[in-house]
């Protein structure tokens, strides 16, 4: 299954810009290609919102949309301020305890605070050094849903065995990230994430597509 996300800018009833993200690494995992390491989270199908209300056909309340955007930005600013490090006390401020984190290829999905710390933030913090937050191209919300993307959002330097791929280098990798959120009352309930891991890994000298090609030759 090929997971993707699209963003478009419309001016004068025509599309003027677009951004298209493909989670090729997740696709490679579904194909069980040997060059892709095991994930620390669950690898499978990432569904839509469990509330089944992700499609809006009518204008939503600006007030509700602003609540969602403010929550997203509060959480992000706290995370960036902590150098991309997360604790349970941090999560308690912005996330429901039964949060679902639908992670990208290479990481996988996590459930609850403990699952999130074990499946994502623990390995992420242990094996990557935060270098720079590069900002977002778009931050937007409507009703209980919102999201952003960057090109890139983050710059990180490997310092260990990130995603099972050891790389001793001073090279800095760019992370192009999509984050989509569902707010439930005053906290985040679900989060869908895409990371262009193939681009990040290539920045630090790891070309998984080339490795896979060589295995087939």
Predicted regions and their residues:
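C-terminal and inter-domain tail/linker signature
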Residues: 1-217
